C-alpha cells in the first residue's frame, strides 16, 4: 500500500506492538501528528506538559511492562528536552525509542529554524541513533531501532526523521517482527562448570541481584537458584523485586543506604555471585575493600561490565535467565545452615529503624505498603524519599519499583508514574517525591488530570533538599548552602489548580485515611506530608568508605 512517511511511522509502531506513545507536537513533526490523528483508534497518544515528561513517561511505561517505551518530539528544543529522559533510560538500561523530526533535507545544515543535530547530542546516551533523510531508509531504520532497544542489554535508541521524509510516499509492506533470542552464545559449558565448582567449594555464598535479573525475566530462576545453593540474597536499587522481599533469605539492599545485614554479610561471605548488576560506586563503596574475603562470580549480558569496576574471579557473559536455568539443572542442592543462621542474626541485630514518636518518611512508606498489601507500583524521584521507598516497601515481584538509579534524575517520578499507569492500569501507582524533586516537573499533574490518570502523588515535604542537607550535616560541618526550600509554594493549591484532588497531612493519624481516600478516588490525587527537616536516611556508608563500615544514628551518638 502507498503511504506517506508519517503513515509508515504509525504502521511500523503498530507492527512493533506499540499501543501508547508519549509526546508533544511541533512544526517539523506535524506531518506525523496529522497521521496520528488518523491512527488514533490504534495508537493512543498521550500529550504531556513538557517533552521531558514524555521521555520519563515512556521510560516508566517500559519499566512497568517490559515493552519498548516510545516518545516523540519536534526538532530543536523539543528534541533537546528529551535528552535528560534519554540519559536516564540509558544509564538504567530501559528499552526506549525516541522519534524526533528535523528540518527538511534541502535546508539541513544551514542553521535553519529549530535545527539541532540531535543525533550528535544524543550519541553518548543512546545504544544507537539514526537520522533518516531518504524515505527508502525509513522502514528498516525503525525496525532496527526497536530491535536494538530490546536486544541484549536494553537501552534507548533515537530516530531523527527529516521533514521531507514524513511527507513523501512509498509502498509499505507490513512484517511480523522476529522474536529476539536471548544472548547465550557468549558463555561456555566450561564457564558453568567452573561456577558450579566454586559454588560447591563455598561455605558462605551470597547472591547479589541487579536490574539485569528483571530485564531478563529471571526472577523465578533466581528464586530456584537461591534455594538450590542455600544462599541469602541482596539486591541493588534497580534490582528491587527481582527476589521477593518478604522471603526469609532476603537481606535487603546493598551499598550506601543498604541494610547492615547486606553490607556486613557481603563483607563476610566467601563467594559473591553477582547477577545483572554493574558494581556501581553506590553499591561497592571502597572497591579495594569490597567483598574482600570472597571470590566473585559475575553474570551479565554486557561483556563491558565484566572487570570494569570490580575484578572478578569468573565472568559469565550471557542472558541471566538462560544461565541460571542451566545452573539450576546442573547443580546439586547445597546446605549452609550455619551461614544462614549468621545472616539471620545480622538481620535481627540490625533491623531498619526510625523515630516512631513523630511523622516521618519511613512511616508513610510503611502505611502505603500496608494499605496496598505490597501490591502497588512505586515510582520515585531522587533523594531521601527514594531511599525510604526502597527500604520500607516490600517489593514482591519485578517491575514494582520504578526509579532513576544511575542518573539520579530529580523530576523523573511523576512522568514515570503516568507511563506506568498506562502500562499497568489494574495496579495502584504511587509517585513518592520530595518537595525539591516535585517542583521540577510538577506540571505533569496537568497531564494526569487531563486524562484522569488515577495516580497518587505523595510529596514528602521537609522544606529542604533533604539528601544534600544530610551530607552537609554529616560531611560539611552543617554549612547549609542553598538547600533550604522554606518558601511560599502551596503544593496543594498547585495540584488543585492543575485539576487534581489534594490532601495535606501533618500527623501520623492522618496518614492512613489520606491514603485510603486517594486509593478510592477515580483520578489523580496529591498527598502532601509535612515532616521535619532533620530526618535522615540510615544506614549509610560514607562516600568512598567501606560497606563493612556502614553506620546508623546510634553509631553516630556512640562516637
Residue ranges of model-derived segments:
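Phosphate/pyrophosphate-binding active-site segments
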Residues: 136, 197, 293-384, 508-512, ...
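N-terminal alpha/beta PP-like core and its mobile active-site loop of ThDP/TPP-dependent enzymes
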Residues: 1-331, 367, 371-374, 454-457, ...
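Thiamine diphosphate
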Residues: 114, 450-543
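A short acidic, glycine-rich active-site loop
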Residues: 46, 181-185, 404-407, 477-486, ...
